[in-house]
C-alpha cells in the first residue's frame, strides 16, 4: 500500500496541499503540490558522482506544461507536446534563480529538477505552485540544500497589495511581482509595473517576503514528518601548505591597481597568464603531484577575493569609475533607412542595435496557453550573437538566456506602450546586441525606447534601464551603478531596474549569496534612480518625444466605426462589394463584429479612398437628398437606379424629365450614371426617385 503523507495549510486566499510518498518514489524526492485545482508534480534527482573538472554547478530545472492539464489536445500534426514554449522556459528560469545560491559552494553533483503541470485552474497560474513544490522537494530530499524558500506573487490594486492574485485580479493590477526568499533574506525578484515609485516597489517586496514565511514554516513541518537525512558532503580542503604557497605566489604577482583602466579582454588575458604561470611553477615545485583543476579553482576564488577587496577598500572599479558613475553613452536614432524605426545605443563596451517594425492585427502573435488563449500585439526579441563578446559560437534558435532577457526588456516597455485604440498597430522590437560587457538587456530597453519614438509609436514616456551590483563582506557593502560583466561575475547581486522619470516599469533582482536585507534593496533603488535620470537626460538630447508621423515604409491603418447592421452592405452579396473595393484601392480591410472597420495600406491616398467609399456605402439615405446612381434595369414604366451598397430605387417614367417620355430607352441607357433625388422610402425600404430638374436630359 502506498504511504502518502499530506500536509495542508492556508496561504492567503488559497489552500496549499503538499502530498509526498506515493508518486515518483525512485526520485530523491517528489511532491505533488496543489493550489485550488492547479496541481504540479515536482521531482528532484541527484547524481552520486561529482563532476570535478566542471567549473560550474550542474543544476538543470525543467518546467513543463501538459495540455491535458487544461483538458486540451496539443497542436501540430503529431498532437504531442514538443520543445518547451517561451512561457515554460521563463518559468524554468524563475524556479532556478532563487534556489541556485542555496546549494553548498563547491557542490558539483548533477541535479535535475522537473516540474510538470498536471492540472490547471485558469485563475491560478502554475508558476508559484511549482516554486513551492520545488522548495518542498529539495527540503525533503537527501540533497544538501540551505532552504526552504518561499515564493509569492504580489499584485497592487486600488493602493492595496494582493497576495497571489487570480488571473482576473492580475489583469486589473498595476503590479505583477514575484518574490522568493528564505526566512531571513530575499533571493530573487521578478516584476513588471505600471510606473510605480521605488517605495511602492520596496513595500511590495517586503509584503511578499513577509507573507511567504507561511510557506517556509509549513515546509519545515512537512520535513519533520517525511524528510530524509541529508547526505554528508563537505568541500574538500586543499592542503594548507599548498594553499599558503599559492596564495603568496599569486599575491606577489597580481597588482590590482595596475588592472584599473585596462580593457576587459586585456585584463582577463593578464590574469589568465598569471594563473597559468603559477600552475606551471607549482607543478615543477610539487613534482606534478597536484590536481590542476583544484589549483585553478583555488586561484579563481583567490582572484575574486582580491578584486572584491580592492573595490571595497578603494572605492575604485576596474575601469576607473567611482561606484555611482555610469559609463560613457553614445546614441544615434534613425540610422537604418528602410526600417520603421531604429536606434544604436552604446554604453561603454555594451552596444545594442534596436529596430521597431509596425504591422497590423494579422501580425499579432496568437498564444494558446494553459490558462487561456490571448493575442499579443507587442513583441520584443533579444539576440545575443557570439561576436558581441569577441567569441565564436553556435548561431541558431534563441537560447534560454536570450528569451529571458527579451522578456525582461519587454516588461520594461509595457507600461508606456499605447493601447489598440490609441495606436492600432502590432509592434515588434528587435534588439541585436552587437557588443557586450554587462547590462545588455538594459541597453536593449534604452534602445527600444529610442527606436519606438523614431518609429512614431506614441509611447507615454522615455524608458531607461540600468544594472546595479553589490559587493558585500559581513556588514560592509558597496552598491555599484551600471556594472560591467567582470563586476557581475565577482559580485553578490544583479539588480536590473528600468523606469521613466516618474517611476519603475520593471525590476529583476538575483542574489548570488544566501540573501540580502531590505536596507540593501532600498539603497540600490535610490542609486538606480539617480543613474536612470542621468541616462534619460542623455537619451532626451537625441529624441525626446515620438515622431509626429510613422515611416513612409510602414502601413497606414485607418479605423472607422459603422452601425453593425450595415456590415452586410460593406461586404455585399457573396463578398462582392468588399472584394471590388479592396481590388480597386489595393487595401486590406478588416471588419469586426462591433462595426469597427480597419483599412490598411502602404499608400495613404488609396486608404483614404477606401474609407470614403465605406462611409458612402454605410451612409443613411435621406429623403430629399440627391445622390449619384447607376441605371441597372430599364422597364416600360421607368428605370431602376442603384445608388450604393446595392440600394435600388425606381425612377418612374414621369420623373425622368419635365417633358413627356414615350420610351425610357430614348433617355436612359444601362450603366449610365445619373443624379437622382429621393422622394419617398416606404416601410419595406423601397425608394421612389426623381431625375426631374437635376439632370440635363
UniProtKB/Swiss-Prot annotation:
Q: Which GO terms describe its cellular component?
A: cytosol
| CDD domains cross-referenced by the UniProt entry | KH-I_PNPase, RNase_PH_PNPase_1, RNase_PH_PNPase_2, S1_PNPase
Domain of life of the organism encoding this protein: Bacteria
The cofactor required is:
Mg(2+)
Instruction: Give yes or no: UniProt keyword DNA repair.
Output: no
EC number annotated for this UniProt entry: 2.7.7.8
| Quaternary structure and interacting proteins, as annotated | Component of the RNA degradosome, which is a multiprotein complex involved in RNA processing and mRNA degradation.
Which family does this protein fall into? Answer: Belongs to the polyribonucleotide nucleotidyltransferase family.
Record's function text:
Involved in mRNA degradation. Catalyzes the phosphorolysis of single-stranded polyribonucleotides processively in the 3'- to 5'-direction.
What is the protein named? Polyribonucleotide nucleotidyltransferase
Amino acid at each position: 500500500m502506498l504511504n502518502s503523507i499530506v500536509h495542508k495549510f492556508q496561504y492567503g486566499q488559497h489552500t496549499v496541499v503538499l502530498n509526498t510518498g506515493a508518486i515518483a518514489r525512485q526520485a530523491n524526492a517528489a511532491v505533488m503540490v496543489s493550489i485550488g485545482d492547479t496541481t504540479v508534480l515536482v521531482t528532484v534527482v541527484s547524481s552520486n558522482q561529482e563532476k570535478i573538472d566542471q567549473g560550474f554547478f550542474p543544476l538543470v530545472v525543467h518546467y513543463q506544461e501538459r495540455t491535458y492539464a487544461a483538458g486540451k489536445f496539443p497542436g501540430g500534426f503529431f498532437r504531442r507536446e514538443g520543445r518547451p514554449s517561451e512561457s515554460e522556459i521563463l518559468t524554468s528560469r524563475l524556479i532556478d534563480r532563487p534556489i541556485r545560491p542555496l546549494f553548498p559552494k563547491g557542490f558539483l553533483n548533477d541535479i535535475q529538477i522537473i516540474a510538470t503541470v498536471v492540472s490547471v485552474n485558469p485563475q491560478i497560474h502554475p508558476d508559484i505552485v511549482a516554486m513551492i513544490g520545488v522548495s518542498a522537494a529539495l527540503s525533503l530530499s537527501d540533497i544538501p540544500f540551505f532552504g526552504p524558500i518561499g515564493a509569492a506573487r504580489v499584485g497592487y490594486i486600488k493602493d492595496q497589495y494582493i497576495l497571489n492574485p487570480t488571473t482576473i485580479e492580475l489583469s486589473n493590477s498595476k503590479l505583477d511581482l514575484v518574490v522568493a526568499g528564505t526566512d531571513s533574506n530575499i533571493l530573487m525578484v521578478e516584476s513588471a509595473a505600471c510606473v510605480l515609485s521605488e517605495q511602492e516597489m520596496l513595500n511590495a517586496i517586503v509584503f511578499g517576503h513577509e507573507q511567504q514565511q507561511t510557506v517556509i514554516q509549513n515546509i519545515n513541518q512537512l520535513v519533520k514528518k517525511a524528510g530524509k537525512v541529508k547526505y554528508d558532503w563537505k568541500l574538500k580542503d586543499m592542503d594548507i601548505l599548498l594553499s599558503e604557497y599559492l596564495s603568496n605566489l599569486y599575491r606577489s604577482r597580481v597588482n590590482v591597481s595596475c588592472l584599473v583602466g585596462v580593457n576587459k579582454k586585456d585584463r582577463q588575458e593578464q590574469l589568465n597568464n598569471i594563473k597559468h604561470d603559477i600552475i606551471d611553477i607549482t607543478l615543477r615545485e610539487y613534482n606534478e603531484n597536484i590536481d590542476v583543476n583544484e589549483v585553478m579553482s583555488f586561484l579563481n576564488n583567490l582572484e575574486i577575493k582580491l578584486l572584491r577587496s580592492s573595490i571595497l577598500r578603494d572605492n575604485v572599479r576596474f575601469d576607473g569609475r567611482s561606484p555611482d558613475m555610469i559609463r560613457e553613452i553614445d546614441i544615434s536614432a534613425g540610422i537604418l533607412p528602410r526600417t520603421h524605426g531604429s536606434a544604436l545605443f552604446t554604453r561603454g563596451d555594451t552596444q545594442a542595435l534596436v529596430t521597431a517594425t509596425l504591422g497590423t492585427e494579422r501580425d499579432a502573435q496568437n498564444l494558446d496557453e494553459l490558462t487561456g488563449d490571448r493575442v499579443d500585439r507587442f513583441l520584443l526579441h533579444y539576440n545575443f550573437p557570439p561576436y558581441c563578446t569577441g567569441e565564436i559560437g553556435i548561431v541558431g534558435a534563441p537560447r534560454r538566456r536570450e528569451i529571458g532577457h527579451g522578456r525582461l526588456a519587454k516588461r520594461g516597455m509595457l507600461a508606456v506602450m499605447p493601447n489598440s485604440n490609441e495606436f492600432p498597430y502590432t509592434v515588434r522590437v528587435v534588439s541585436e546586441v552587437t557588443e557586450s560587457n554587462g547590462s545588455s538587456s538594459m541597453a536593449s530597453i534604452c534602445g527600444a525606447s529610442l527606436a519606438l519614438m523614431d518609429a512614431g509609436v506614441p509611447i507615454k514616456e522615455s524608458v531607461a534601464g540600468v544594472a546595479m551590483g553589490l559587493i558585500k563582506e559581513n556588514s560592509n557593502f558597496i552598491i555599484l551603478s551600471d556594472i560591467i560583466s567582470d563586476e557581475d561575475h565577482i559580485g553578490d547581486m544583479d539588480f536590473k531596474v528600468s523606469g521613466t522619470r516618474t517611476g519603475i516599469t520593471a525590476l529583476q533582482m538575483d542574489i548570488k549569496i544566501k540573501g540580502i536585507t531590505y536596507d540593501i534593496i532600498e539603497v540600490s533603488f535610490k542609486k538606480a534612480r539617480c543613474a536612470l535620470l542621468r541616462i534619460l537626460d542623455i537619451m532626451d538630447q537625441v529624441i525626446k518625444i515620438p515622431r509626429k508621423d510613422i515611416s513612409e515604409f510602414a502601413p497606414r491603418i485607418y479605423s472607422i466605426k459603422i452601425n453593425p447592421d450595415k456590415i452586410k452592405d460593406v461586404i455585399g452579396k457573396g463578398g462582392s462589394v468588399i472584394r471590388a473595393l479592396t481590388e480597386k484601392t489595393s487595401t486590406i480591410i478588416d471588419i469586426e463584429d462591433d462595426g469597427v472597420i480597419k483599412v490598411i495600406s502602404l499608400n495613404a491616398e488609396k486608404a483614404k479612398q477606401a474609407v470614403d467609399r465605406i462611409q458612402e456605402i454605410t451612409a443613411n439615405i435621406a429623403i430629399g437628398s440627391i445622390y449619384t446612381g447607376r441605371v441597372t434595369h430599364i422597364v416600360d414604366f421607368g428605370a431602376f437606379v442603384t445608388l450604393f451598397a446595392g440600394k435600388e430605387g425606381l425612377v418612374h417614367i414621369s420623373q425622368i424629365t419635365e417633358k413627356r417620355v414615350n420610351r425610357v430607352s430614348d433617355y436612359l441607357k444601362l450603366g449610365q450614371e445619373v443624379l437622382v433625388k429621393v422622394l419617398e422610402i416606404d416601410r419595406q425600404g423601397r425608394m421612389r426617385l426623381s431625375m426631374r430638374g437635376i439632370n440635363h436630359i
